[in-house]
Amino acid sequence: MKKINKMKKLILLILLVAISTSCEDFEGWNVDKKNPSEVPADFLITSVEYTLFLRMTSISVNYNIFKYFAQNVGSTTYQDEPNYDLRNRDIGGTLFIYLYRDMLNDLADAKQIVADNNDLASVKANKLGMIEVLEVYIWTILVDTYGNVPYTQALNSSEFLLPAYDEDEAIYGDLFRRLDQALLFLEPGGVSFSDADLIYGGDSDMWIAFANSLKLKMAVRVADADAGMATQKATEAYNAGVIMTSAGNFAYPFEASPPNTNPLWTSLVQSGRSDFIVANTFVDLIVPLNDPRTPIYLDDNQIPYVGGIYGTNSPFANYTHIGTKFHESGLEGLLMSSSEVSFLLAEAVEKGLIGGDAEGFYNSGVTQSIEYWTGSSDDAAAYLAQPTVSYASGEWKDRIGTQKYLSLYMTNGFESWSSWRILDYPLMNIALESGLPVPRRYVYPNDEAQINGVNYEAASSAMGGDELDSRVFWDITGAGNAGAGITD
């Protein structure tokens, strides 16, 4: 078995190298799903899962800058990205390519290969359902990051070399439909890709719970834009069963030895560089709360803890470093946890989307996060007993927003930023050198205006411009505390 696993990893590595060296021009991401690759579907699934967690959990600006958007970290030297300059290194273009070409394209290929093979009908249905769930998840990342994106004409260059952009709200509506269809395909107790699925081992029950949790997240996202849709979908998801324990976490098993190590280790240890310190935004929030996760989240190189001023050079030796737990090469990647789902349920109750006990869900979210990092339920109980932490329904956006933010530290900057855009908590700092607030979206790739100009202009105009402060459809100005969340 070990030899088989090693062979799979070797083939995966070869595939990843081939992908990374392919052309990154416009045709490179808008490929034709009618001409699938000759790679077996199993290897495509393994590759997509690895690529997804690599790109989304990394701290490297070559992959994403979500941990800057969440102000988890600051930079010791390079200040373009902490000050929200996405144009210099084409940050928007990099993520665009990875999501379309390296993930959605491979999943489209895998779907066609599975549809054409001779698997038993039940196995084929489970495989197709799993692929569809992954596709929907990746599409939500695209929409939540950019707003309007190519959708109906994407991945089909033989017919649409220059694809039109669909409206973000319309895409979400179709993604709900597709997720419901995927859940019909997934059979409780069924199996799909088995060992090729490194997240859930092909376990359909796990994928069903994740799909329902994703539906819940999408419903909470759209609540301020379409309360009716949000109520329907949140209720469906909750009643069908979401991730409730850490055993169901949407997590990836990075390995202790290269090449499949956690990308945080690559940037923080293997690189030999000292580029990152913890931002004052995070340090100033967690330390006064007497949070039991503090000695895990933060290194003790500076006592008392001192966060780097966000958006300006912060000498590595003078400020608090990222906790050594995040320097572990085999630390699992985490993109959805039972803790996050509990916070989503609390938010759904407060928004009137589902019935239930918001305080109970909130307490569960806090407890599960602390248990995940410290292993201590006693720590969680003592923490929740503090007046600054205990639930207060009249301040639910502050309490849920703050504790969800703390729970997502260094694991999922994207979700931390997305939650902040809805709840506007906790307070974020203005980037010191640029004077800019936290962006509401990524800008489009630098070359879209030249290559796909007509469609780019239409999409940008519909959103109020291709600007950092333009909003995706669910980020409603004036909803609740919208417009808050920023401090000098």
Regions found by a protein language model. Give the residues of each.
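Bacterial Sec-dependent N-terminal signal peptides
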Residues: 1-31
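Long, intrinsically disordered, low-complexity segments
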Residues: 22, 41, 261-288, 294-298, ...
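Structured, solvent-exposed acidic/aromatic patches
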Residues: 38-42, 74-375, 392-397, 486-488
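Beta-strand acidic-aromatic groove motif in beta-rich domains, primarily in extracellular
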Residues: 57-66, 147-149, 230-231, 415
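Membrane-proximal, proline-rich intrinsically disordered regions
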Residues: 23-71, 76-77, 87, 98-101, ...
